[in-house]
């Protein structure tokens, strides 16, 4: 996935978007796959 404002996709094992559109490895974040929001992850790393 590519987070808002990012010109490169997130790492495969860090495919999360933070509140400011940044790529994050830990929660809280939005797990993404393509352009579809999968689920909120508040405690675990998105994988």
Curated annotation (Swiss-Prot):
Disulfide bonds join 3-17, 10-23, 14-46, 16-31, 25-29. Keywords: Disulfide bond, Ion channel impairing toxin, Knottin, Neurotoxin, Secreted, Toxin, Voltage-gated sodium channel impairing toxin. Expressed by the venom gland. InterPro entries: CNTX (IPR035285). It comes from the Eukaryota. It is found in: Secreted. One of its GO terms (molecular function) is toxin activity. The keyword Cell membrane does not apply. Its main location: secreted. The presence of a 'disulfide through disulfide knot' structurally defines this protein as a knottin. Inhibits the inactivation of voltage-gated sodium channels (Nav). Belongs to the neurotoxin 03 (Tx2) family. 06 subfamily. This is Delta-ctenitoxin-Asp2e. It comes from Ancylometes sp. (South American fishing spider).
